[in-house]
Regions:
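A conserved beta-strand-loop-helix scaffold within acyl/acetyltransferase catalytic domains
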Residues: 2-50, 57-64, 106-112, 117-232
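Conserved acyl-donor/pantetheine-binding loop and adjacent beta-alpha core of acyl/acetyltransferases
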Residues: 61-75
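The substrate-binding groove and active-site-proximal loops of carbohydrate-active enzymes
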Residues: 75-82
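Non-catalytic accessory segments adjacent to catalytic cores
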Residues: 85-118
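Aromatic (often tryptophan-rich) hydrophobic motifs at membrane interfaces
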Residues: 90, 194-292
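Short catalytic-loop micro-motif centered on adjacent basic/acidic residues
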Residues: 103, 149, 254-258
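C-terminal "cap" of GNAT-fold acetyltransferases
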Residues: 118, 122-124, 286-297
Protein backbone atom coordinates (compact mmCIF):
# COMPACT_ATOMS: atom_id res chain seq x y z
CA UNK A 1 0.00 0.00 0.00
CA UNK A 2 1.30 3.45 -0.93
CA UNK A 3 0.47 6.46 1.21
CA UNK A 4 -1.86 9.06 -0.29
CA UNK A 5 -1.91 12.64 0.93
CA UNK A 6 -4.54 15.37 0.90
CA UNK A 7 -3.47 18.09 -1.55
CA UNK A 8 -5.27 21.39 -2.05
CA UNK A 9 -6.16 22.65 -5.51
CA UNK A 10 -3.43 25.29 -5.71
CA UNK A 11 -0.78 22.70 -4.81
CA UNK A 12 -1.70 20.22 -7.56
CA UNK A 13 0.79 19.77 -10.40
CA UNK A 14 -1.64 19.53 -13.32
CA UNK A 15 1.03 18.23 -15.73
CA UNK A 16 1.87 15.30 -13.46
CA UNK A 17 -1.82 14.78 -12.73
CA UNK A 18 -2.73 14.49 -16.39
CA UNK A 19 0.20 12.18 -17.07
CA UNK A 20 -1.11 9.83 -14.38
CA UNK A 21 -4.61 9.88 -15.87
CA UNK A 22 -3.42 9.27 -19.42
CA UNK A 23 -1.10 6.45 -18.32
CA UNK A 24 -3.83 4.84 -16.22
CA UNK A 25 -5.65 1.70 -17.26
CA UNK A 26 -8.71 3.96 -17.18
CA UNK A 27 -7.52 7.11 -19.01
CA UNK A 28 -10.85 8.86 -18.63
CA UNK A 29 -11.20 12.40 -19.91
CA UNK A 30 -13.57 13.14 -16.97
CA UNK A 31 -10.56 13.03 -14.61
CA UNK A 32 -8.23 15.31 -16.54
CA UNK A 33 -7.45 18.67 -14.99
CA UNK A 34 -9.05 20.82 -17.72
CA UNK A 35 -12.29 18.83 -17.35
CA UNK A 36 -12.35 18.95 -13.55
CA UNK A 37 -11.50 22.66 -13.59
CA UNK A 38 -14.74 23.21 -15.50
CA UNK A 39 -17.03 20.78 -13.70
CA UNK A 40 -15.71 21.17 -10.14
CA UNK A 41 -13.92 24.49 -9.74
CA UNK A 42 -11.36 24.43 -6.93
CA UNK A 43 -11.31 20.63 -6.62
CA UNK A 44 -8.78 19.07 -4.27
CA UNK A 45 -7.28 15.58 -4.28
CA UNK A 46 -5.72 12.62 -2.57
CA UNK A 47 -2.37 12.01 -4.26
CA UNK A 48 0.19 9.24 -3.87
CA UNK A 49 3.95 9.73 -3.89
CA UNK A 50 5.12 11.30 -7.17
CA UNK A 51 1.53 11.10 -8.46
CA UNK A 52 1.60 7.31 -8.65
CA UNK A 53 -2.13 7.33 -7.90
CA UNK A 54 -4.67 10.16 -7.71
CA UNK A 55 -8.21 10.58 -6.40
CA UNK A 56 -10.06 13.84 -7.21
CA UNK A 57 -12.15 15.36 -4.44
CA UNK A 58 -15.01 17.36 -5.95
CA UNK A 59 -15.81 19.15 -2.71
CA UNK A 60 -18.70 21.53 -2.16
CA UNK A 61 -20.02 23.20 0.99
CA UNK A 62 -23.56 24.02 2.11
CA UNK A 63 -24.94 24.99 5.52
CA UNK A 64 -21.31 24.92 6.68
CA UNK A 65 -21.03 21.22 5.85
CA UNK A 66 -18.60 19.81 3.29
CA UNK A 67 -19.96 17.20 0.93
CA UNK A 68 -18.74 15.28 -2.09
CA UNK A 69 -21.08 15.38 -5.11
CA UNK A 70 -20.66 13.98 -8.59
CA UNK A 71 -19.98 16.91 -10.93
CA UNK A 72 -22.20 17.71 -13.89
CA UNK A 73 -21.40 15.94 -17.18
CA UNK A 74 -19.21 13.39 -15.41
CA UNK A 75 -19.91 9.69 -15.10
CA UNK A 76 -16.78 8.12 -13.58
CA UNK A 77 -14.14 9.40 -11.15
CA UNK A 78 -12.56 7.65 -8.15
CA UNK A 79 -8.97 6.37 -7.94
CA UNK A 80 -6.67 6.40 -10.97
CA UNK A 81 -3.11 5.30 -11.67
CA UNK A 82 -1.17 2.43 -10.16
CA UNK A 83 -3.07 1.40 -7.03
CA UNK A 84 -4.00 -1.57 -4.88
CA UNK A 85 -7.24 -2.53 -3.20
CA UNK A 86 -5.75 -1.21 0.04
CA UNK A 87 -5.13 2.16 -1.61
CA UNK A 88 -8.76 2.31 -2.72
CA UNK A 89 -9.97 1.37 0.75
CA UNK A 90 -7.77 4.10 2.23
CA UNK A 91 -9.36 6.70 -0.05
CA UNK A 92 -12.88 5.52 0.68
CA UNK A 93 -12.25 5.47 4.43
CA UNK A 94 -10.80 8.98 4.17
CA UNK A 95 -13.78 10.50 2.38
CA UNK A 96 -16.30 8.73 4.63
CA UNK A 97 -14.62 10.31 7.67
CA UNK A 98 -14.25 13.74 6.05
CA UNK A 99 -17.59 14.22 4.28
CA UNK A 100 -21.09 13.93 5.71
CA UNK A 101 -22.67 13.38 2.30
CA UNK A 102 -21.03 11.44 -0.53
CA UNK A 103 -22.63 10.94 -3.93
CA UNK A 104 -19.88 10.00 -6.37
CA UNK A 105 -19.42 7.56 -9.20
CA UNK A 106 -16.31 5.37 -9.18
CA UNK A 107 -14.58 4.35 -12.39
CA UNK A 108 -15.04 0.76 -13.55
CA UNK A 109 -11.60 -0.33 -12.21
CA UNK A 110 -12.54 0.64 -8.65
CA UNK A 111 -14.12 -2.69 -7.81
CA UNK A 112 -16.33 -1.80 -4.87
CA UNK A 113 -19.68 -3.02 -3.62
CA UNK A 114 -21.45 0.23 -4.47
CA UNK A 115 -24.73 0.66 -6.30
CA UNK A 116 -24.24 -0.10 -9.98
CA UNK A 117 -24.63 2.37 -12.82
CA UNK A 118 -23.75 1.85 -16.43
CA UNK A 119 -22.59 3.46 -19.60
CA UNK A 120 -22.22 2.07 -23.10
CA UNK A 121 -18.84 2.00 -24.80
CA UNK A 122 -17.19 0.89 -28.00
CA UNK A 123 -13.78 -0.68 -27.51
CA UNK A 124 -12.07 -0.08 -30.83
CA UNK A 125 -9.84 -3.11 -30.31
CA UNK A 126 -12.96 -5.27 -30.62
CA UNK A 127 -15.33 -5.62 -33.58
CA UNK A 128 -18.55 -3.61 -33.38
CA UNK A 129 -21.47 -3.09 -35.72
CA UNK A 130 -24.64 -1.06 -36.17
CA UNK A 131 -27.95 -2.92 -35.91
CA UNK A 132 -30.53 -2.96 -38.71
CA UNK A 133 -32.65 -0.19 -37.18
CA UNK A 134 -29.62 2.07 -36.97
CA UNK A 135 -28.66 1.31 -40.56
CA UNK A 136 -32.20 2.15 -41.71
CA UNK A 137 -32.11 5.48 -39.91
CA UNK A 138 -28.72 6.33 -41.39
CA UNK A 139 -29.99 5.48 -44.87
CA UNK A 140 -33.13 7.58 -44.30
CA UNK A 141 -31.02 10.60 -43.39
CA UNK A 142 -28.73 10.12 -46.38
CA UNK A 143 -31.70 9.69 -48.73
CA UNK A 144 -33.05 13.01 -47.42
CA UNK A 145 -29.83 14.64 -48.55
CA UNK A 146 -28.50 15.17 -45.03
CA UNK A 147 -24.75 15.42 -44.55
CA UNK A 148 -22.39 15.71 -41.58
CA UNK A 149 -19.95 18.57 -41.19
CA UNK A 150 -17.27 19.13 -38.57
CA UNK A 151 -17.55 22.51 -36.88
CA UNK A 152 -14.54 24.69 -36.08
CA UNK A 153 -14.05 25.39 -32.38
CA UNK A 154 -15.02 29.08 -32.46
CA UNK A 155 -18.24 28.25 -34.29
CA UNK A 156 -18.75 25.22 -32.03
CA UNK A 157 -18.80 27.43 -28.94
CA UNK A 158 -21.42 29.67 -30.54
CA UNK A 159 -23.53 26.72 -31.73
CA UNK A 160 -23.32 25.10 -28.30
CA UNK A 161 -24.67 28.27 -26.74
CA UNK A 162 -27.36 28.60 -29.41
CA UNK A 163 -28.59 25.02 -29.62
CA UNK A 164 -27.30 22.90 -26.73
CA UNK A 165 -27.81 25.26 -23.78
CA UNK A 166 -31.55 25.59 -24.56
CA UNK A 167 -31.64 21.79 -24.91
CA UNK A 168 -30.08 21.41 -21.45
CA UNK A 169 -32.60 23.85 -20.00
CA UNK A 170 -35.82 22.90 -21.76
CA UNK A 171 -35.40 19.20 -22.49
CA UNK A 172 -33.15 18.01 -19.66
CA UNK A 173 -34.32 20.50 -17.02
CA UNK A 174 -30.81 21.50 -15.97
CA UNK A 175 -30.42 24.68 -13.95
CA UNK A 176 -28.38 27.78 -14.79
CA UNK A 177 -25.37 26.49 -12.84
CA UNK A 178 -25.25 23.33 -14.96
CA UNK A 179 -25.70 25.34 -18.15
CA UNK A 180 -22.79 27.57 -17.13
CA UNK A 181 -20.61 24.55 -16.30
CA UNK A 182 -21.38 23.10 -19.72
CA UNK A 183 -20.19 26.20 -21.54
CA UNK A 184 -17.05 26.47 -19.40
CA UNK A 185 -16.32 22.83 -20.21
CA UNK A 186 -16.83 23.37 -23.94
CA UNK A 187 -14.48 26.37 -23.87
CA UNK A 188 -11.86 24.52 -21.79
CA UNK A 189 -11.97 21.56 -24.17
CA UNK A 190 -11.63 23.86 -27.18
CA UNK A 191 -8.65 25.60 -25.59
CA UNK A 192 -7.00 22.21 -25.02
CA UNK A 193 -7.75 21.13 -28.64
CA UNK A 194 -9.88 18.28 -27.33
CA UNK A 195 -13.30 19.47 -28.49
CA UNK A 196 -14.91 17.96 -31.58
CA UNK A 197 -18.29 19.16 -32.79
CA UNK A 198 -20.36 17.83 -35.66
CA UNK A 199 -23.59 19.07 -37.18
CA UNK A 200 -26.03 17.54 -39.62
CA UNK A 201 -27.42 19.89 -42.25
CA UNK A 202 -30.18 19.40 -44.80
CA UNK A 203 -30.21 20.46 -48.45
CA UNK A 204 -31.17 23.99 -47.36
CA UNK A 205 -28.10 24.20 -45.08
CA UNK A 206 -30.37 24.14 -42.01
CA UNK A 207 -29.02 22.49 -38.85
CA UNK A 208 -30.90 19.26 -38.17
CA UNK A 209 -28.68 17.90 -35.38
CA UNK A 210 -25.62 18.86 -33.39
CA UNK A 211 -23.31 16.87 -31.13
CA UNK A 212 -20.23 17.69 -29.04
CA UNK A 213 -17.50 15.20 -28.23
CA UNK A 214 -14.37 15.45 -26.09
CA UNK A 215 -11.37 13.21 -26.71
CA UNK A 216 -7.92 12.88 -25.14
CA UNK A 217 -6.66 10.45 -27.78
CA UNK A 218 -7.49 7.42 -25.65
CA UNK A 219 -10.96 8.06 -24.26
CA UNK A 220 -13.66 9.85 -26.26
CA UNK A 221 -17.00 10.89 -24.79
CA UNK A 222 -20.26 11.91 -26.39
CA UNK A 223 -20.80 14.99 -24.25
CA UNK A 224 -24.18 16.21 -25.44
CA UNK A 225 -26.23 16.35 -28.60
CA UNK A 226 -29.72 16.93 -29.88
CA UNK A 227 -31.69 16.91 -33.11
CA UNK A 228 -34.46 19.12 -34.43
CA UNK A 229 -36.38 16.58 -36.49
CA UNK A 230 -37.74 14.42 -33.68
CA UNK A 231 -41.31 14.44 -35.02
CA UNK A 232 -40.25 13.61 -38.56
CA UNK A 233 -37.76 10.95 -37.38
CA UNK A 234 -35.45 11.52 -40.32
CA UNK A 235 -32.45 9.79 -38.73
CA UNK A 236 -30.24 12.83 -38.27
CA UNK A 237 -28.95 11.79 -34.85
CA UNK A 238 -28.12 8.27 -36.02
CA UNK A 239 -26.21 9.78 -38.91
CA UNK A 240 -24.31 12.20 -36.68
CA UNK A 241 -23.25 9.75 -33.98
CA UNK A 242 -22.38 6.98 -36.46
CA UNK A 243 -20.16 9.49 -38.26
CA UNK A 244 -18.46 10.43 -34.98
CA UNK A 245 -17.87 6.78 -34.10
CA UNK A 246 -16.14 6.20 -37.44
CA UNK A 247 -14.25 9.49 -37.13
CA UNK A 248 -12.67 8.54 -33.79
CA UNK A 249 -11.74 5.02 -34.86
CA UNK A 250 -7.95 5.07 -35.08
CA UNK A 251 -7.85 8.30 -33.05
CA UNK A 252 -9.07 6.86 -29.74
CA UNK A 253 -9.10 3.56 -27.87
CA UNK A 254 -12.63 3.86 -26.51
CA UNK A 255 -15.80 5.67 -27.53
CA UNK A 256 -17.94 6.33 -24.46
CA UNK A 257 -21.60 7.27 -24.77
CA UNK A 258 -21.22 8.70 -21.23
CA UNK A 259 -24.29 7.20 -19.62
CA UNK A 260 -25.39 7.08 -16.01
CA UNK A 261 -29.14 7.07 -15.48
CA UNK A 262 -30.29 5.88 -18.88
CA UNK A 263 -33.79 5.49 -20.24
CA UNK A 264 -34.60 2.31 -22.13
CA UNK A 265 -34.85 4.33 -25.33
CA UNK A 266 -31.43 5.89 -24.91
CA UNK A 267 -29.86 2.56 -23.98
CA UNK A 268 -31.39 1.05 -27.11
CA UNK A 269 -30.02 3.90 -29.21
CA UNK A 270 -26.50 3.30 -27.86
CA UNK A 271 -26.73 -0.47 -28.29
CA UNK A 272 -27.90 0.00 -31.85
CA UNK A 273 -24.73 1.95 -32.59
CA UNK A 274 -22.53 -0.88 -31.32
CA UNK A 275 -22.22 0.12 -27.67
CA UNK A 276 -21.57 -2.55 -25.05
CA UNK A 277 -22.72 -2.07 -21.47
CA UNK A 278 -20.02 -1.16 -18.94
CA UNK A 279 -20.95 -1.13 -15.25
CA UNK A 280 -19.37 1.05 -12.59
CA UNK A 281 -20.10 1.91 -8.98
CA UNK A 282 -22.12 4.72 -7.43
CA UNK A 283 -21.25 5.52 -3.81
CA UNK A 284 -24.12 7.14 -1.91
CA UNK A 285 -23.50 7.72 1.81
CA UNK A 286 -25.59 10.13 3.87
CA UNK A 287 -24.34 10.92 7.38
CA UNK A 288 -25.89 14.36 7.55
CA UNK A 289 -27.25 15.56 10.91
CA UNK A 290 -30.93 14.74 11.38
CA UNK A 291 -32.02 18.37 11.13
CA UNK A 292 -30.29 18.75 7.75
CA UNK A 293 -31.90 15.54 6.51
CA UNK A 294 -35.26 16.90 7.63
CA UNK A 295 -34.60 20.18 5.82
CA UNK A 296 -33.61 18.34 2.62
CA UNK A 297 -36.98 16.53 2.64
Amino acid sequence: MSKLFYITHKEIDFVKWDQTILNSKAPLVFAQSFYLNATSAGWNALIGEDYKSVFPLTTKSKFGINYLPQPHFTSQLGLFGDFTKEDLNFCLDYIIKKYKLIQIELNHLCNHSATSKCTFVIDYKKPYSFNENTKRNISRAQNNGFKVEEVKDNDAILLSQTYLVPFLKNDLGLNEEAQSVFMILVKNAAKEKKLHTFKVINTNEEVMAIGTFISNGKHTIFLKGTNFDKKENTGSMHLLVSHAIKYFEGKSETFDFAGGSLSAGLAGFYKGLGGEQLNYGYLNINNLPWYIKLFKK
